Amino acid sequence: RVFDIIAEPIRFHKTASSEKEIAQIVHDLLEHVGLGESASQKYPHEFSGGQRQRISIARALSCRPKILICDEPTSALDVSVQANILNLLKDLQADLGLTMIFISHDLPVIRQMCDRVAVMLHGEICEIEETEKLFKSASHEYSKHLIKLMPRLHSNI
């Protein structure tokens, strides 16, 4: 059940002193990610992809981290669900004071979500820059190449 999925890291790390406190934390997390307490009694297969991602986010937050690593957090989701998850992550970042590290090939998502970007080439960082500065005037050739390949809307009307 979803309750157990979210409660497991709390129990493992002993960040709550009682089962009652664990239940309250799980309830609060489910509310915070927009699922509600009733989700705790269901199984993952009963949820959509976006809802499962919300469950994963709740689990990741269950031990109150200061840093959240998001590795391709929206890659398997359709565009409208992607937007909802990204908005949720932005809200959680503001509400909880989280630092987030985004790992993604989706440059529009990176542009929307990140303050600073590190571009990697063959497993090594080739450029680190503030997001808008990087997208406007990247200095490394590989960064320029990636930005050039980004999908763009053309207005020929």
Model segments located where?
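Conserved ABC ATPase "signature" region
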Residues: 20-38, 147-148
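Hydrophobic anchor residue at the start of the ABC signature
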Residues: 57, 85
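A short, proline-enriched helix->beta-strand linker immediately N-terminal to the Walker B motif
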Residues: 62-66
